[in-house]
Amino acid sequence: EYNDMNSTELYNRFISEQASGGVSGDVVWSSSMDTGLKLATDYAMEYKSPEQSQLPKWAVWKDKAYGTTYEPVVFIYNKRLIPAGDVPDSHAALAKLIASQTDKFKNKVTTYDIEKSGLGFMLSVQDHNADPNYFKTLADVAKGGLSVQSSTGPMMERVSSGENLIGLNLLGSYAEARAKNDPSLGIASPKEYTLVLSRVSFISQQSQNTNAAKLWLD
C-alpha cells in the first residue's frame, strides 16, 4: 500500500503512529529534506543498501537515510498569457516583473503555503540563505497578493487554466511531466541560483515487512 500526502502531513502522521505504537509505514519517502532527516535521526533503521556504491557520497547519511532524486526548483508560467519577453530568468527578474505590473499580477502568483507544506518552508529558508535580498524580493513578489497552496498539483492546475499566471518554487520533476502534455504550461529556471532537492528515504525501525522494505529501497 502506497500513501501519498504532502510533506507536513507525512511528518505528523508518522510521528503520531510511532507515538501510539500502531501500524505505520515500512518506508518513509519525503521531499522535505529537513523534516525527512529529522525523522530518520529518530526512527530510521540502519541499512547498507547494495546499491550504495552507485550513489554519490552526499546521498548517503549514516547508512540510514538516502537521497534518491536530484530535482531542480523552478518557476512555471502560463504560456498563453505571459509574453515570451516577460518570462523571468531570475528571482530578481520575477520580483521586478510583478512589481512593475501589479494590476496584472494581483492575486495571480502562486507558491507553497509554508504553514502547511514542510517542503515550502524548507525552500523558503534556502531562498533566504541564497539570496542576500530575499526579503525585498519576497515583498515585491507578494505586492499583488500571493495565492498559496499546500501541494504542487493545484498550483500547476491554476497556472495552466490562467487562474494564476506564475508559480514560484515548484518541483521541476512535476512541472516537466505536466508540461509534456500541457501546451499552456511553461517552465523557467532562475539563472542566479537554482535550488535542488533530493527526496529522503529510509526504512523504519518498526518496519513489519523489513525484507520488502529493503527491496523497495534498493
Spans of features found by a protein language model:
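Short, hinge-like loop/turn segments at secondary-structure boundaries
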Residues: 19-20, 46-47, 184-186
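Glycine-rich, charged/polar anion/phosphate-binding loops
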Residues: 171-172
